[in-house]
Amino acid sequence: MKKLVVLVSLCLVFGCYQTQRNCSDYKTGTFYSEVSINNVVYKSTFKRTNNMQVEMYDGKTDSTHVRWINDCEVIYKTIHPKNMAEQKDIHLKIIMTTDSSYTFEYSYVGDTKKQKGIAYKLD
């Protein structure tokens, strides 16, 4: 009986905890992003509207079409791809939000290897 009480208590505590995801707050705006790949941190700033995103990184500008699947998932398609990698669409999923940032995971569409990053809303 004692084990049952402990088990039920744990289920109630962990069952009530849910990761905050107010994804619609991050559909549009200006953002700063950091992604770590192979221990190298890549930084960029980007402005996203309902249907387009313009990103600046390493002195380059990249533009993509934006297609929201739901409030927390989006597909990016590069407007003028310069190579085979840029021709692949990217799937991004917001996995957690705070009042000023969101944590995300992303991969090429159909790829199982995912990367994670964080974006901070600037406006």
What residues fall within each predicted segment?
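C-terminal motif of bacterial Sec signal peptides marking the signal peptidase cleavage site
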Residues: 12-15
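N-terminal glycine/threonine-rich, aromatic-flanked beta-hairpin/loop signature
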Residues: 41-69
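Tryptophan-anchored aromatic micro-motifs
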Residues: 23-39
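Bacterial signal peptide processing site
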Residues: 17-19
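Positively charged n-region of N-terminal signal peptides that target proteins for export
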Residues: 1-4
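A short, structured loop/turn motif at beta-sheet edges
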Residues: 65-73, 94-101, 121-123
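Short, exposed beta-strand-loop hairpins at the edges of beta-sheets
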Residues: 55, 94, 103-115
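An anionic, turn-rich surface loop/hairpin at beta-sheet edges
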Residues: 76-99
